[in-house]
């Protein structure tokens, strides 16, 4: 692109001003910025950091999608939500990370108006869908642990919920897509390494009034961060209380006491994981939202705005995007079924026959399951509704309780008939 003159032709000088006065006025009103916002070492550091989380996001979320779609036994309600979370995080990696990195490295917007609108819309929708899916996972865990005998979600209802999530994400980001536009910054130019000047273009929300942008920022903050965070914290606190209040095995044998100690340690690990999930979401997105609110509501000087846009925003965006890269680890690796599904899928592809991998991954040996379960105390229910969260939705027989992942827990202890006051419900520790 050819450089435009930094001064207009002589015929455009306003009447009543001589040439020297105009030259002085133009020299003081024009702003020149470097084409690259950072030095080479700083830019290399940002590029390496963004490439790292991009690769983690692509590999981790692709593996989650592969495991769920490859194994029919993994297509449970919660895993459908985790699959949707992986899809939305993949969109974050594809559409958010590269454009944000480019926008943070160079001055101005290098793409056209259509890319400006579509990039903003897809970015906002993918982030919103990711956050809304985290809430859906928390609600589903809450229903299965705190209220295990209430009617469970079916796969059809889960898919409908996912469709609603994306519809809400589209609805909340429509104002941004409408107002986003590419505008040329008057009296502001970019300079390359050879001192050639280029016009500066920006992709930003052109609201009719500045106050409307402030209101929209507050709405986004409430719907994409504050309310989801409150719901996630409330749900996980209730789950943690339920786990902590659950009694151990009723038998007083030495083996039962030892199993009770192991159960307590497993409960503690589950509670720690729930705390980690809530804290990680809070800390990942809080810096970016603080900066966005400062831009709209803080009375910042030009120097402060420049420092925030050049240094603070790239770090805040990186931290928020890291959340999408770490979700497969939090919701996938810490889930026993995902670990076994991953092993089964790759053993079947690499060297094992499919039937052997399937048998190894989904073995229902009682001693293995017993070591990985958490006992939760629940009240008996007269409804006897089976769990429809998994592939097995048949009505459980006497002495058996439905689990959220479609398995059945056998109750073979004494005094566990219909007249028993409390029934222990076993739940896989990392599947909540």
From Swiss-Prot:
Protein name in the entry: Neuropeptide FF receptor 1
Cytoplasmic side: 65-80, 139-158, 236-273, 331-432
Keyword set includes Phosphoprotein: no
Ranges of Low complexity composition bias in the record: 380-406
Subcellular location: Cell membrane
GO terms of molecular function: G protein-coupled receptor activity; neuropeptide receptor activity
Tissue: Expressed at high levels in the hypothalamus. Moderate levels found in the midbrain, thalamus, medulla oblongata, testis, eye, whole brain, cerebral cortex, striatum, hippocampus, cerebellum, optic nerve, placenta, spinal cord, pituitary gland and ovary.
Glycan attachment residues as annotated in the record: 10, 18, 113, 195
Organism name: Rattus norvegicus
GO cellular component labels: cilium; plasma membrane
Superkingdom field: Eukaryota
Pfam families named among the record's database cross-references: 7tm_1
Gene that this sequence comes from: Npffr1
Region (Disordered): 380-422
Side Extracellular, residues: 1-43, 102-117, 180-214, 295-309
Family affiliation: Belongs to the G-protein coupled receptor 1 family.
């Amino acid at each position: 692109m050819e450089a435009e003159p930094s001064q207009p032709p002589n015929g455009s000088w306003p009447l009543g001003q001589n040439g020297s006065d105009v030259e002085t006025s133009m020299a003081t009103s024009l702003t020149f910025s470097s084409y690259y916002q950072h030095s080479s070492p700083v830019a290399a550091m940002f590029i390496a950091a963004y490439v790292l989380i991009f690769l983690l996001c692509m590999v981790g979320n692709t593996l989650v999608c592969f495991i769920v779609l490859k194994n029919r036994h993994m297509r449970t309600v919660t895993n459908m939500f985790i699959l949707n979370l992986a899809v939305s995080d993949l969109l974050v990696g594809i559409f958010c990370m590269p454009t944000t990195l480019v926008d943070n490295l160079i001055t101005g917007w290098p793409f056209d108006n259509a890319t400006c609108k579509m990039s903003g819309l897809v970015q906002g929708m993918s982030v919103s869908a990711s956050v809304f899916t985290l809430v859906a996972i928390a609600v589903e865990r809450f229903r299965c642990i705190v209220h295990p005998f209430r009617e469970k979600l079916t796969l059809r209802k889960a898919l409908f919920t996912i469709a609603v999530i994306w519809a809400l994400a589209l609805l909340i980001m429509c104002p941004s897509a409408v107002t986003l536009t590419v505008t040329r910054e008057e009296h502001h130019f970019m300079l390359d390494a050879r001192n050639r000047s280029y016009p500066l273009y920006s992709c930003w929300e052109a609201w009719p009034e500045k106050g409307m942008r402030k209101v929209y920022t507050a709405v986004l903050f409430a719907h994409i961060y504050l309310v989801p965070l409150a719901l996630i914290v409330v749900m996980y606190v209730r789950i943690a209380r339920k786990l902590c209040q659950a009694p151990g095995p009723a038998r007083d044998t030495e083996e039962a006491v030892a199993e009770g100690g192991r159960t307590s340690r497993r409960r503690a690990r589950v509670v720690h994981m729930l705390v980690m999930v809530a804290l990680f979401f809070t800390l990942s997105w809080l810096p970016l939202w603080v900066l966005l609110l400062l831009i709209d509501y803080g009375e910042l000087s030009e120097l402060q705005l420049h420092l925030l846009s050049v240094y603070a925003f790239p770090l805040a965006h990186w931290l928020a995007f890291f959340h999408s890269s770490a979700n497969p680890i939090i919701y996938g690796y810490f889930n026993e079924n995902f670990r076994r599904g991953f092993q089964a899928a790759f053993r079947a592809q690499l060297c094992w026959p499919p039937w052997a991998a399937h048998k190894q991954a989904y073995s229902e040996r009682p001693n293995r399951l017993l070591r990985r379960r958490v006992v939760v105390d629940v009240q008996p229910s007269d409804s006897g509704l089976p769990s429809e969260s998994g592939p097995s939705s048949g009505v459980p027989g006497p002495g058996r309780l439905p689990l959220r992942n479609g398995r059945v827990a056998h109750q073979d202890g004494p005094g566990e008939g219909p007249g028993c006051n409390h029934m222990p419900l076993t739940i896989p520790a990392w599947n909540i």
